[in-house]
UniProtKB/Swiss-Prot annotation:
It is found in: Cytoplasm. HAMAP family: UDG. It catalyses: Hydrolyzes single-stranded DNA or mismatched double-stranded DNA and polynucleotides, releasing free uracil. This is Uracil-DNA glycosylase. The gene is ung. The keyword Amino-acid biosynthesis does not apply. It is an enzyme of class 3 (hydrolase). GO terms for cellular component: cytoplasm. Its EC number is 3.2.2.27. It comes from the Bacteria. Gene3D superfamilies: Uracil-DNA glycosylase-like domain (3.40.470.10). The keyword Cytoplasm applies. GO terms for molecular function: uracil DNA N-glycosylase activity.
């Protein structure tokens, strides 16, 4: 199977915002690495048509919040008898029918504690994406069962470019940076016109995410700037 990343559709407004990224030498390198991996018969997650799912589900015009993840889930599970990747192109999200990963369970625990939201029974965060939450991974692909295996592709140049472009061309966005890796992206963001909310990573290996009030803080900021808050319970 081969795939041309240029042929994967994303909305025109995102294409225009990120035109210089897609035309850059580093993105040509990403495409070469990706094509080589496919030609080498690597099992790659998420599926090719879902690589840019975050941009397809979240209209640029209604963008309010960016939640930065690091690496796509590298595992899979069985849904209705079919082996299915955990990764679906949205940070922290897994398809309906997939067991909820530990980090997402902690995200739900924080929602329960701070906003009294009953934890969903699934891990599909598409409902957030459609409300204007960009669920962006810093690295957009991974080889099955091999975490960070595509780090050398150069995806982080792309995700850094996305963050810079949003910081420069949008106003009053909330950037959620959870964990030390994400916090290092703060210098890419103009804090004079955006809200940066940091917290420990929601992984059970870290402590302090539950009780951080990150979702409450985000909605307070949005309302202060005449924006509709995110209905975090709508999933």
């Amino acid at each position: 199977m081969t795939i041309n990343l240029d042929k994967i559709k994303i909305p025109d407004d995102w294409k225009q915002l990120l035109a210089s990224e897609f035309l850059s030498p580093y993105f040509a390198d990403i495409k070469t690495h990706y094509l080589n991996a496919l030609q080498n018969k690597e099992m790659i997650y998420p599926k090719p048509h879902q690589i840019f799912a975050a941009f397809n589900l979240t209209p640029l015009s209604s963008l309010k919040v960016v939640i930065l993840g690091q690496d796509p889930y590298h595992g899979s599970g069985i849904i209705e008898g079919v082996e299915t990747p955990q990764a679906m192109g949205l940070s922290f999200s897994v398809p309906r029918g997939m067991p909820i990963p530990p980090s997402l369970k902690n995200i739900y625990a924080e929602l329960s504690q701070s906003l009294h939201i009953t934890p969903p029974t699934h891990g599909d965060l598409s409902g957030w994406a459609r409300q204007g939450v960009l669920l962006l991974n810093a690295i957009l692909s991974v080889r099955a069962n091999a975490p960070a295996s595509h780090k050398h592709f150069g995806w982080e140049y792309f995700s850094d470019g996305v963050i810079r472009a949003l910081s420069a061309h949008k106003e009053h966005l909330v950037f959620m940076l959870w964990g030390n890796y994400a916090k290092k992206k703060a210098p890419l963001i103009d804090a004079s016109k955006h809200k940066i909310i940091t917290a420990p990573h929601p992984s059970p290996l870290a402590r302090g995410f539950v009780g951080s009030n990150v979702f409450l803080q985000a909605n307070i900021y949005l309302q202060e700037h005449a924006k509709e808050p995110i209905a975090w319970e709508k999933l």
